[in-house]
C-alpha cells in the first residue's frame, strides 16, 4: 500500500510529523551553522509548523469535548488559544 501524504494523514499524525520537523529545525538553528538566509527560511518554516501543530491541538480538544459529552455537542466551542501578540 502506498504511503499516505502529509495532507491525507490524520491530524494526530500530522501533529507528530510537524512537531518532529519543528524540533529538527530548532536543533539546526541552535547550532548556529546556518546562514542568515537559511535561518530566515527555517524560521518561516518553523512558524508554519507551529501553526499546524496549534490547529491540530485545537481539533483534538474539540474531539475530546465531543467524546466527553456527546449528548451536548453545543458545549464543543472552539478553543481560543492565547494571543501571540506581546
Curated annotation (Swiss-Prot):
Class in the EC hierarchy, top level: hydrolase
Family membership: Belongs to the XseB family.
Chain's gene name: xseB
Main subcellular localisation: cytoplasm
Self-association state and partner proteins as the record states: Heterooligomer composed of large and small subunits.
GO-annotated biological processes: DNA catabolic process
Functional description taken from the UniProt entry: Bidirectionally degrades single-stranded DNA into large acid-insoluble oligonucleotides, which are then degraded further into small acid-soluble oligonucleotides.
Localization of this protein: Cytoplasm
InterPro entries the UniProt entry points to: Exonuc_VII_S, Exonuc_VII_ssu_sf
NCBIfam families: PRK00977.1-4 (NF002140), xseB (TIGR01280)
Keywords assigned: Cytoplasm, Exonuclease, Hydrolase, Nuclease
Reaction(s) this enzyme catalyzes, per UniProt: Exonucleolytic cleavage in either 5'- to 3'- or 3'- to 5'-direction to yield nucleoside 5'-phosphates
Gene Ontology annotations for the cellular component aspect, listed alphabetically: cytosol; exodeoxyribonuclease VII complex
Protein EC: 3.1.11.6
Organism, as annotated: Xanthomonas axonopodis pv. citri (strain 306)
GO molecular function: exodeoxyribonuclease VII activity
Protein name, entry field: Exodeoxyribonuclease 7 small subunit
Amino acid at each position: 500500500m502506498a504511503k499516505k501524504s502529509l495532507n491525507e494523514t490524520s491530524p494526530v499524525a500530522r501533529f507528530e510529523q510537524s512537531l518532529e520537523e519543528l524540533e529538527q529545525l530548532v536543533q539546526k538553528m541552535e547550532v548556529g551553522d546556518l546562514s542568515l538566509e537559511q535561518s530566515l527560511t527555517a524560521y518561516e518554516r518553523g512558524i508554519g509548523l507551529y501553526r499546524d501543530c496549534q490547529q491540530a491541538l485545537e481539533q483534538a480538544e474539540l474531539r475530546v469535548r465531543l467524546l466527553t459529552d456527546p449528548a451536548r455537542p453545543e458545549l464543543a466551542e472552539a478553543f481560543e488559544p492565547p494571543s501571540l501578540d506581546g
